[in-house]
Amino acid sequence: MKRIARKSLFAALSLSLLAGCTIGGPDSGPVAEDNPPAASPENELFIYTVYPAFYVKEDVFEKQIGQLIKKKFPDVTVKHVHWDNPGRRYEDLIAAGTIPDIIIDNTRMNVQRYIIDNDLHYDISDLIKKYNFDTSKLNPGLMAQMRNLSPEGKIYGLPFNNNDFVLFYNKDIFDKFGVDYPTDGMTYDEIYELAKKLTRVEGEITYKGFSQNPGHYMNYNQLSLSPLSLTEDKASLSTPEWKKVVDNLRRFYEIPANQFDTVETFATKANIAMAVATVDHIVSFHEQNKNLNFDVVSVPSFSDAPNTRYQPNVYSMYITKQSTKKDLAFQVMAAILSEENQIELAKEGVIVPLETEPVKEAFGQNLPQMRGKNTKAIFHGQTAMPPAARAEGLVWYDVPMQNVFAPLIFKESKDSVTALRMIEEQSTKEIATKKAATETIDKAASKQ
């Protein structure tokens, strides 16, 4: 009853906000039961994209998704809206009663707080059975994340694009210092030894052996650790496993002269020998510096978890509870995940959940920036499994994992245990505040 009452109160707030001002973020309350989706033609499918961010360009969406749907479903008209400010955020659509049929969004960051908390989620398990869709053909790590959104293993969506990571390396720096290039399947210990050899100061140039975004490293850690307790409303970082993860990265930072800057300067400054970044940087680094002599290999892994990629950084497709076209929506999603269409998306540099040999071979074929690059590195090993599902009803909070390193380790020289404990305590307080605010809203709603 509390949740139902909260829906009405949040919807009213959303309407008043929409009428009165521009809203700063895509946060909103659940859909009101008396605010049904606006009627639309039976052959129109409303797709709302938040991630991938490049779907803000309609021509990219049309090329990768729109044309695919038109080819398979010629009688279907696609209405596409991409998250934007103002007027195109979750709360705006909810307030207007224009609920999408399919939402494509970042699973780790947004599904709990925007889709589930807004009561837009829908268990598609029956549709999977009805259309005999084989989920086992998809990347197991990505499907595990789909199932782990619910402690009962309900499936609210299917993966679309995994924005995965690789290790970039500057061949010229390796050649300059006579060091052999890295190879697929190397461990952090091996990469650390390379980083020490490649970190040097020559005149006014500081060559950095290794760089890494600490937030990405922590959030998508390869040991499948969760920063949140799976059973209680609190953070959970004071463990030997988390210390192991932190100690592993901080040793790179503590190599003299190898203090991390940002991986984004890999191409522009060209003084970083190795850097972990998302695969799409193959294109962006090339465009930033067409003379950059670089290639990629698989991300380093822990010696006791060899050949393990990062946890899923996946953007997934979700059918909304409010959609009146769930069957059509699912058939469209299934068509997108067919090998034929996965190959076409892979050619455009989309890391798709289907990892058959034809898909791997097709990756990046339509992108001249990827020609000659070791794109097989993207598929080396297996995706790390995501953490298990949390208990029902727990507050979701995006623990600022990057703060363990910046500023606590990088600027304040905290030891690993202290840095982890400080972020754990700060996050637990924020979770308590968020929980109290929710309880206040529940009380207000119950009085209506």
Each model region followed by its residue ranges:
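Conserved N-terminal structural module of periplasmic/extracytoplasmic solute-binding proteins
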Residues: 3-118, 135, 290, 304-305, ...
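Hinge/lid segment of periplasmic solute-binding proteins
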Residues: 110-164, 295-297
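Paired acidic/hydrophobic, glycine-rich loop segments that form the ligand-binding mouth/hinge
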Residues: 101-104, 273-278, 295
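Extracytoplasmic/periplasmic solute-binding protein
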Residues: 150-160, 165, 175, 189-235, ...
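Mature extracytoplasmic/periplasmic domains
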Residues: 39, 283, 319-394, 418
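Glycine-centered hinge/linker elements that transmit conformational signals in sensory
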Residues: 232-261
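Short helix-initiation/N-cap motifs at beta->coil->alpha
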Residues: 81-89, 186-192, 258-269
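Extracytoplasmic/periplasmic substrate-recognition and gating elements
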Residues: 71, 95, 287-353
